[in-house]
């Protein structure tokens, strides 16, 4: 700063003694220096005696001043550096002295560049002249103001930023439109064509150039049905839009007022107020539309860290990290799935555990991505997220939800859901509760709603009345019993009664669907309205059975806006899908009948009870049947509109019998094996009727080849199709017409050739009762003469011998009559000397004979020799009813004489023999059937069906004489009971279950069911780890003892 005038006056007083001679001497010295044109160090020092005190700046700050000074001295660079102190004329004396010391140090460093032949002597006059420079002169007093002005001009640029705001405001005011500027006109156009009209006007301007006297066209996305045209006159606008489509030329063109012109293009930007635990949605990238939770905010860098459910394709990631080639095609967006670190390690993906230095939390780092607790922590820009009007659904919140210690879910961050709701949300009289702040959980009623504050009235004493609370700190409050209506969200329009309040979540019993609906308290209002809801969209109504485009099927349980909620036909678990109208293929209206577990017929509207599966114990009428799946309506079931999905074999008809033919167990063994039923007994030997095709047994078909009268033996049997397009399918025979058989498959009824079905048929309950089921009873049947009414003799008297016991061989080796078998042995028990039936009493070794090829004239039934109940003597598979039973308690000798008089196993009189201990079939023998048949063994899971009791599950622990010891419970840890075989049924295993093989070559082996292919199971056997394909009927669920 320049010194004040008072300081100058004091200096003038100190130097009044200086006479005029000194001034003259200085002038003479200057003339001498100019005359020499050279300079030593003394001349350099003298040359700096006089300079313009107000023309130079501080040389230490500005290098340009040094250059100016040096050029004014004839290019003497060294002199300019020696005279740096002369630029500090506006500093105090003390400051000058400090600078002078610094200058001396610089001079010492620059001596190498100065040629100095002389010696500098101290010059007292020079010192006086040096001090004299600071003395102002009267004639230069007026230059102080000029100096101050020049300094301000030079250094004012350093502070120009302080005045930018004021200057900007002025400039903005100057930019506002005035009456001299072009005007803005509103032109009406077709809705949705605003952008198209603007582009057409631009193209028209390009084509016609200056002839189109308009300045600009504006089409705003939020303003429908109008565009803005900037022009000087209305006539110019009319000329521009003349002949254009989508513009209503006959409509009046409106002039926008000048003060409103700026509002057309002004954008109201709201400051984003983000805090932790705020819910946001992603706008771009792989996670577009996904819900995210803010965990950190960096306001300086305008970035946030969010927590997302990962969308990571681990296979593609592993390929990328290994350097393998990745397909460049547009990849599908992976579904959201929590990150499994163990799965990533199995794919040899490198996983590093790192600690965040800011939060101290540990994260798993995979390829630069951070994961914690299965979530993906990602840092994104504020521009890539949406903050306004983010309302998560319950499904999304449950994925982010962490169960508390007591196992109940806590929807954390619910208060942040209400931060972006619309204004006018609360109305006078609404019951509210404070959700955060010092007054949290305070209840009250709304009195008045201001801009951002709500005035509430509370019953708590000592508080202001009314009390002003910020709108973001309030939430609506309801109590159980209130009738409400949903006004926003997924269930908008639904009405119901509040049955439970969980924090700020209401559970409502819907008036239409009678199911529980969860909604936010902020999304409902109290209402007495009861809505019936939409019951039909297009051709589909509520509770219709529909077929979807992916060939799945289900029942419509709810109608939403242009969509349906469909309960799919998956019996294992309830699966609900939201489908569009276009995704439904057709409506299924077929009337199909199926059979329950006990072979009772189930039709629509029949009441059934579920005895197995996740819906066990449910009961109700059948609404739909499709592919063996029942859709049952249970009015006590509050979910899924009351519908339950179950397999028909997991249900029983209410009021139906436990077995179709004989409740006492006459047909109970048909569940365990494919037993053949005996032929009907004729009234007399001559009363047998031949079918029209020459067949026997009152039927045609495979017995005679023609069409018979009466009931066919195939009716009601379960057969397997072995030829044709339906090869491998099984189902019951529902009709026989000549050589065609109608078989009911699970999907439909098909007609196949009679020769295309397998002989391995299973007897169903409504066929004849097996005569081999009673075991050792005395007598087997009540003694009657004859055994059946009006039947004398009981069997065909022309059959000699009457049974196969007089025939050698007794058993079948592919039924080859030329194969001698003495002693007779079963083809699968050749080496078992303990097998029954090897005694001569049963098979007196008669010579081999052609048993089926010598018909006796007049005989209506059997051939001679050796009558048979079975088929003709062609090679075939045959499951004998007399399978070997090597049990120690079955006596083989003595047996019963097989005389032609009667069958030994029937106690009829005359000719009958009592059966004690009996040689009939023991049902609890380890083997009770032919091939592909199932039987009981220890450590297998079974269903227990006792008369008058509900079905229980148990594990067979022991198989003894005629009974089974069963431990209740799926793991066999319950009570132990005794059960008859007719009361037990093997539970079929499912995929991945441990199984036990109960028949065939691998009988008794255990393994794992690794797959199911139709009626076959793929089993990995434990003993040799071989994989075998076995019939599911041979597999039982194994329970480890």
From Swiss-Prot:
GO BP terms in the entry: regulation of DNA-templated transcription elongation; regulation of transcription by RNA polymerase II; transcription elongation-coupled chromatin remodeling; translation
Q: Where is this region: Disordered?
A: 1-133, 662-713, 768-921
Instruction: Give the matching Gene3D superfamilies.
Output: 2.30.30.30, NusG, N-terminal domain (3.30.70.940)
**Similarity comment text for this entry:** Belongs to the SPT5 family.
User: Which PANTHER family does UniProt cross-reference here?
Assistant: SUPPRESSOR OF TY 5 (PTHR11125), TRANSCRIPTION ELONGATION FACTOR SPT5 (PTHR11125:SF7)
Residue intervals of the KOW domain: 273-300, 425-452, 477-504, 601-628, 712-739, 988-1015
The molecule here is called Putative transcription elongation factor SPT5 homolog 1
In this chain, where does the modification Phosphoserine occur? 59
């Amino acid at each position: 700063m320049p010194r004040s005038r008072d300081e100058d006056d004091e200096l003038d007083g100190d130097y009044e003694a200086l006479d005029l001679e000194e001034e003259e001497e200085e002038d003479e010295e200057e003339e001498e220096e100019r005359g020499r044109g050279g300079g030593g160090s003394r001349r350099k020092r003298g040359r700096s005696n006089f300079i313009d005190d107000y023309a130079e700046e501080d040389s230490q700050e500005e290098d340009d001043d040094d250059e100016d000074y040096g050029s004014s001295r004839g290019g003497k660079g060294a002199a300019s550096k020696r005279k740096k102190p002369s630029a500090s004329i506006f500093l105090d004396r003390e400051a000058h002295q400090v600078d002078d010391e610094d200058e001396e140090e610089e001079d010492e460093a620059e001596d190498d560049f100065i040629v100095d032949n002389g010696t500098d002597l101290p010059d007292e006059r020079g010192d006086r002249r040096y001090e004299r420079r600071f003395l102002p002169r009267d004639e230069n007093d007026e230059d102080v103001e000029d100096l101050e002005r020049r300094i301000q001009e030079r250094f004012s640029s350093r502070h120009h930023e302080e005045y930018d705001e004021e200057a900007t405001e002025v400039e903005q005011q100057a930019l506002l439109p005035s009456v001299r500027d072009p005007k803005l006109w509103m032109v009406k156009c077709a809705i949705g064509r605003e952008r198209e009209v603007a582009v057409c006007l631009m193209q028209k301007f390009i084509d016609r150039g200056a002839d189109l006297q308009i300045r600009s066209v504006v089409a705003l996305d939020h303003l429908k049905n109008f565009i803005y045209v900037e022009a000087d006159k209305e006539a110019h606008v009319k000329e521009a839009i003349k002949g254009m489509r989508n513009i209503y030329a006959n409509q009046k063109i409106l002039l926008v007022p000048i003060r409103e012109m700026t509002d057309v293009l002004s954008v109201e930007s709201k400051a984003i107020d983000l805090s932790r635990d705020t819910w946001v949605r992603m706008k771009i990238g792989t996670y577009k539309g996904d819900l995210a939770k803010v965990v950190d905010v960096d306001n300086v860098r305008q970035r946030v860290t969010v927590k997302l459910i990962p969308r990571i394709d681990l296979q593609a990631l592993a390929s990328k990290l290994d350097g393998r080639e990745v397909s460049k095609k547009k990849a599908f967006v992976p579904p959201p799935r929590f990150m499994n670190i163990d799965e990533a390690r199995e794919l040899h993906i490198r996983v590093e555990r790192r600690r965040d230095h800011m939060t101290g939390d540990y994260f798993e780092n995979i390829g630069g991505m951070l994961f914690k607790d299965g979530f993906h922590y990602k840092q994104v820009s504020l521009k890539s997220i949406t903050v306004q009007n983010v309302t998560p659904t319950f499904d999304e919140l449950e994925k982010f939800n962490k169960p508390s210690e007591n196992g109940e879910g806590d929807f954390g961050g619910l208060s942040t859901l209400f931060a972006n709701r619309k204004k006018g949300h609360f109305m006078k009289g609404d019951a509210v509760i404070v959700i955060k702040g010092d007054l949290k959980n305070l209840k009250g009623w709304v009195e008045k709603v201001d801009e951002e504050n709500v005035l509430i009235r509370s019953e708590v004493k000592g508080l202001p009345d009314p009390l002003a609370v910020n709108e973001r700190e309030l939430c609506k409050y309801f109590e159980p019993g209130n009738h409400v209506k949903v006004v926003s969200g997924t269930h908008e329009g639904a009405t119901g009664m509040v049955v439970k309040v969980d924090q700020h979540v209401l559970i409502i019993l819907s008036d239409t669907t009678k199911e529980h609906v969860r909604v936010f308290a902020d999304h409902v209002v109290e209402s007495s309205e009861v809505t019936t809801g939409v019951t039909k969209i297009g051709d589909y109504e509520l509770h219709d059975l529909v077929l979807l485009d992916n060939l799945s099927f289900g029942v419509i349980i709810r109608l939403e806006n242009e969509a349906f909620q469909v309960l799919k036909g998956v019996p294992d678990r309830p699966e609900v899908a939201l489908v569009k109208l276009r995704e439904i293929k057709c409506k299924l209206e077929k009337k199909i009948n199926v059979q329950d577990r006990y072979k009772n017929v189930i039709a629509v509207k029949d009441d059934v009870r579920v005895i197995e599966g996740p819906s066990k114990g449910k009961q109700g009428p059948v609404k739909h049947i499709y592919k063996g799946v029942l859709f049952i309506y249970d009015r006590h079931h509050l979910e899924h509109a009351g519908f339950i999905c179950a397999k028909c074999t997991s249900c029983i008809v209410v009021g139906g019998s436990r077995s179709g033919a004989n409740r006492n167990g006459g047909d109970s063994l048909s569940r365990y094996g494919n037993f053949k039923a005996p032929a009907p007994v004729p009234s007399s030997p001559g009363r047998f009727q031949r079918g029209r095709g020459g067949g026997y047994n009152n039927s045609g078909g495979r017995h005679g080849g023609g069409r018979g009268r009466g009931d066919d033996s195939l009716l009601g049997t379960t057969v397997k199709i072995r030829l044709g397009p339906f090869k491998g399918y099984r189902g019951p025979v529902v009709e026989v017409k000549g050589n065609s058989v109608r078989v009911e498959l699970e999907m439909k009824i098909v007609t196949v050739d009679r020769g295309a079905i397998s002989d391995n048929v299973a007897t169903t309950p409504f066929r004849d009762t097996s005569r081999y089921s009673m075991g050792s009873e005395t007598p087997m049947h009540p003694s009657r003469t004859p055994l059946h009414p009006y039947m004398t003799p009981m069997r065909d008297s022309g059959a000699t011998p009457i049974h196969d016991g007089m025939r050698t061989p007794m058993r079948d080796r592919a039924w080859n009559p030329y194969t001698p078998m003495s002693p007779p042995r079963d083809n699968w028990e050749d080496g078992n000397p303990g097998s029954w039936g090897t005694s001569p009493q049963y098979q007196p070794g008669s010579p081999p004979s052609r048993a089926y090829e010598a018909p006796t004239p007049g005989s209506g039934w059997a051939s001679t020799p050796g009558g048979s109940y079975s088929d003709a003597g062609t090679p075939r598979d045959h499951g004998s009813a007399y399978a070997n039973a090597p049990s120690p308690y079955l006596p083989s000798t003595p047996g019963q004489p097989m005389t032609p008089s009667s069958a030994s196993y029937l106690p009829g009189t005359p000719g009958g023999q009592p059966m004690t201990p009996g040689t009939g079939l023991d049902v609890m023998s380890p083997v009770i059937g032919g091939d592909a048949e199932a039987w009981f063994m220890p450590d297998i899971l079974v269903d227990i069906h006792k008369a008058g009791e509900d079905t229980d599950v148990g594990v067979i622990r022991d198989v003894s004489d005629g009974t089974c010891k069963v431990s209740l419970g799926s793991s066999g840890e319950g009570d132990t009971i005794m059960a008859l075989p007719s009361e037990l049924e093997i539970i079929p295993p499912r995929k991945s279950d441990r199984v036990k093989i109960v028949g065939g070559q691998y009988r008794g082996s255990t393994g794992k069911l690794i797959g199911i292919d139709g009626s076959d199971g793929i089993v990995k056997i434990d003993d040799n780890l071989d994989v075998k394909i076995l019939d599911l009927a041979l597999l039982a669920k194994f329970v480890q003892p």
